[in-house]
Amino acid sequence: VSSDSMEDIIDYQLTPSIHDLHQLNHFTNILVSLGIKNYPIHIKLNTGMNRLGFDKNEINDLCDYLLAQPEIKVEGIFSHLAASEIVEGKDLTKKQINSFQELSTLMESKLSIDTTKHILNTSGIENYSDHEMDMVRLGIGLYVGSKKPYNSTVASLITRIAKIRNIKKGDHLGYGLDRIKKNMKIAIIPIGYADGFKRNFGNGVGKVYIKDSFYKTVGNICMDMSFIDISNTDLNVGDRVEIFGKNNDINKVAKSINTIAYELISSISNRVVGVYLKD
């Protein structure tokens, strides 16, 4: 994390997660330069995912460092589960939870503090609710349940029909030399792989929802445009097209191209305009 980013964290009074001594030392030096003391942080522990976080053999050095730094206040300790959504991952998840409880208790004892502890992600909340501790981290669960249907949809990806064409059998459509195998009525929608509507959805793999019905893609997904087969309908330019949302479940959409909802949501590009609705 750059110095500018860390200063932004301080300016906006955010709480950083710290995962190694280099990062901690860098952040502490900035606090010293600004004359700030008791700034709250959350410490991340590596309990088995082996991505970010302090390892067990680093805890003593970490605690020694923290005891010598009045600029830092350890407000929370957390870790991240690697396989909480997988039935076969139960042993690993339990091992991670036990390791986290051991290491966080050790830290609290050495530092003589009481912290906010958290390890459960969305799947962890669903499958290991007896380990909620002091807080949980509902990430993808804000948008979709990882397994269970939720009562409301927080996010939808919406576009509208930009143009309608009647294409004859044998005509070309979009990029490539493939020809249409039958007469079709085609809706062109202004969304493509540059927006996050992946090329894998092309040629009938993807389905969109328009006015109470599902319609398949046809042809290749372009960078900025896609084609939908709307034959035998009375749809019009401007009609609302749901890529995923209340009527087109994102888990099913993701499964159709052998991926997960996380990837679809995180793939939506910055050029897609976000509209925030308040109930």
What is each PLM-predicted segment?
Residues V1-D4, D20-N25, K94-D279:
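Active-site anion/phosphate-binding pocket segments in diverse small-molecule metabolic enzymes
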